[in-house]
Design a protein with these regions (language model features):
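Alpha-helical transmembrane segments
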Residues: 34-61, 242-245, 249-252, 296-322
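Basic-flanked hydrophobic alpha-helices used for secretion and membrane insertion
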Residues: 315-580
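Peri-transmembrane interface segments
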Residues: 19-26, 34-66, 81-84, 92-93, ...
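Juxtamembrane interface at the cytosolic side of transmembrane helices
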Residues: 77, 85, 178, 224, ...
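Hydrophobic alpha-helical segments
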Residues: 113-258
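Long, hydrophobic alpha-helical segments
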Residues: 62-77, 580-583
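N-terminal Sec/SRP start-transfer signal
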Residues: 1-32, 197-202, 247-295, 596, ...
Length: 626
């Protein structure tokens, strides 16, 4: 062979088949562009150092894994389509004298040229669009936008390009193996393969119905949010499997049922459409199922992440009714590391610490109060709340999980509540789970004790941050400290060292909520310094420690906004990729079916059907499919 012949032939093939190769090059470039952006965001120190940057690292790592999976699926789908369309062309080459190794050399040059173009174009676009995505991330995180050109990550460039080059090499190897196994006659007749009428695959049909029904049953009946996290992916996988099986087997079943309906089938409008779809559905069912799943994925990802981001402020307000919470405990340990003594810091000391910290940071205290409460988890079964150690399957144990936050009626009064005048066997209940509309039981049994529900209260003055953790979450007001101590001892006997302890904290609200996370951090540092000086006025001795927990609404807002912003960015990116994949599959399906239908519709016209009737057949097929 003349030197350069195969390269010249490869360039000619790419030019003549540009309607196939151009979308493939643009598709790989687009996937590489997104992959580079997500991969680089995961490693950009400037982004990770922003407040909430740790969420970017976590969610972008997930994005990298998803992008790798989508890239493998899409690129191999495109490769299989190109090979199917060009098998006849390769057969002609073989008949004209080119050996299979020569055809593989032509494929090598085609793969090298298209891969090089895709990688260069994808990385160039990725570098340019990375700045835009960085600015978008800063905007979503409510972070300061730093002007100037962001750095080009050489490691991300190399790894991203290498990953897609490896995919192209693997695809080339698969193509060579396919060509080596095929005979020239099979290559020439490959366009006519699959013309036999398919049969209904009953096992797939039954499994598809069961999988789809099971997925929807799980999603509709699961109420516990923690259990929903465990079963969510199970439901998604079942729905995806069911969708694929029903498209493959269910579509054939429906078309055969239409064919058996003589009044419907023996009509010049319906017969060609049903018959044509029946013969082609075997190879097109998977593509249609992919379109349905990807289109659903676009809607779910974007709508879910947008809803989370829009509801971030409401989440913060629900979990942080006040601006600042402070709790502090003094601990003393033995030389062997055993806890000898533990006590809460005096409330007066904590109050003074908050006042000093607010004064230093120019904050005006609007409300400040001492809160004491006990939060206990129970298993709700047979109208009884019991303390049980969970074991075995975590999802099953969460089925009846209930959480109750207790306060005394004296504490309730001090926090602005009305006088309840509760006896020792009476309680007041507030359903704090946003999914609950009310509480209509006359009694509540906790362990072996039954309490009369004297009244329900519309608003509980304390938020422990457990609102989203259980199906049943209540705030309960008890008569006095003795009842609270009894409930504490009750759960202590079961849970032992894992039992819940009393929470004693200061809750403060400041005039105006316009401060930011920096002010919150400085407030926490100043309060911590004051408490350490109060706890250890001389010198901190070995074995002494002070555990301080301070949380501000500003820090929580920035953390929640950062988490939801990172999720929104990932949802937008993956949603666009799924949308792009849907368009790509539709495009290649249209080309594939167009070439196949051209011959069939020419035959229809030759046997006497008018152009208008052929068009009507096409419209009928489209209507049946969608």
């Amino acid at each position: 062979m003349k030197r350069g012949f195969f390269l010249k032939l490869a360039r000619s093939n790419i030019s003549k088949n540009r309607r196939f190769f151009l979308p493939r090059i643009l598709s790989e470039a687009g996937l590489l562009c997104v992959f580079y952006i997500v991969f680089t965001l995961r490693a950009d120190e400037r982004i990770l150092q922003l407040r909430g940057g740790q969420y970017i690292e976590v969610f972008m790592s997930i994005g990298v894994a998803v992008m790798m999976l989508l890239s493998v699926i899409l690129l191999f789908y495109i490769n299989s389509f190109l090979m199917k369309q060009r098998k006849r062309e390769f057969g002609v080459y073989n008949i004209l004298g080119l050996e299979k190794r020569h055809i593989c050399r032509v494929l090598f040059h085609e793969t090298a040229l298209s891969s090089l173009a895709s990688v260069v174009l994808g990385l160039a676009i990725g570098v340019l669009f990375y700045k835009l995505c960085s600015l978008l991330i800063c905007q979503l995180l409510n972070a300061e936008i730093v002007l100037g050109f962001y750095f080009i990550n050489a490691r991300s460039l190399a790894l991203s390009g290498a990953f897609f080059l490896v995919l192209d090499v693997v695809a080339y190897g698969v193509n060579c193996v396919t060509i080596a196994r095929m005979k020239p006659v099979e290559m020439l007749s490959s366009a006519n393969v699959g013309e036999r009428e398919p049969k209904v695959k009953w096992p797939l049909l039954v499994l598809g119905l069961l999988a789809l029904g099971g997925g929807y049953y799980i999603s509709l009946t699961t109420q516990n949010p923690l259990k929903a996290l465990v079963l969510f992916f199970v439901a998604v996988i079942l729905v995806i499997i069911g969708t694929y099986f029903l498209f493959v087997a269910g579509s054939i079943f429906v078309l055969k049922a239409l064919k058996k309906n003589k009044r419907f089938y023996y009509n010049k409008k319906h017969m060609p459409a049903v018959s044509g779809l029946l013969y082609r559905m075997k190879q097109n069912a998977v593509g249609l199922a992919s379109i349905a799943i990807l289109a659903t994925g676009v809607l779910v990802m974007i709508s879910t992440t947008v809803s989370l981001y829009a509801g971030a402020e409401e989440t913060v307000k629900r979990n942080y009714p006040q601006d600042y919470y402070l709790s502090a405990r003094y601990l003393q340990w033995s030389d062997e590391g055993q806890l000898l003594h533990s006590e809460d810091m005096p409330r007066e000391t904590m109050l003074r610490a908050v006042e000093q910290g607010a004064e230093k940071n120019g904050l005006t205290i609007k409300e400040i109060a001492f809160q004491e409460y006990l939060t206990v988890s129970y298993i709700y079964e047979n109208d009884t709340l019991t303390c049980e150690r969970v074991s075995g399957n975590a999802a099953d144990n969460l089925k009846g999980l209930s959480v109750i936050t207790y306060i005394t009626q004296e504490m309730y009064r001090s926090l602005g509540g009305e006088a309840l005048n509760l006896a020792k066997d009476e309680i007041a209940v507030c359903p704090m789970d946003i999914r609950q509309s009310g509480f209509d039981r006359p009694t509540l049994t906790i362990g072996e004790d039954t309490y009369q529900i004297k009244t329900t209260i519309p608003l509980f003055p304390i938020s422990s941050g457990m609102e989203a953790a259980a199906t049943n979450y209540y705030g309960v007001v008890v008569a006095d400290e003795s009842v609270l101590a009894h409930l504490y001892d009750q759960q202590k006997q079961v849970y032992g060292d894992a039992a819940s302890d009393y929470t004693r904290r200061i809750a403060a609200s400041f005039a105006g909520r316009g401060a930011n996370g920096d002010v919150g951090e400085k407030l926490e540092r100043d309060v911590e310094e004051y408490l350490k000086e109060a706890a250890f006025p001389q010198q901190q001795e070995p074995g002494e420690s002070l555990v301080i927990r301070g949380n501000t609404v500003w820090g929580a807002r920035e953390s929640v906004t950062a988490m939801c912003g990172a999720l929104l960015f990932l949802g937008i990116i993956l949603g666009l990729v799924c949308l792009f994949a849907t368009v790509l599959i539709v495009y290649y399906k249209q080309i594939s079916e167009g070439y196949e239908d051209r011959v069939r519709f020419q035959i229809m016209q030759k046997v006497g059907m008018s152009r208008r009737e052929v068009k009507s057949t096409i419209n009928s097929q489209v209507l049946l499919v969608f």
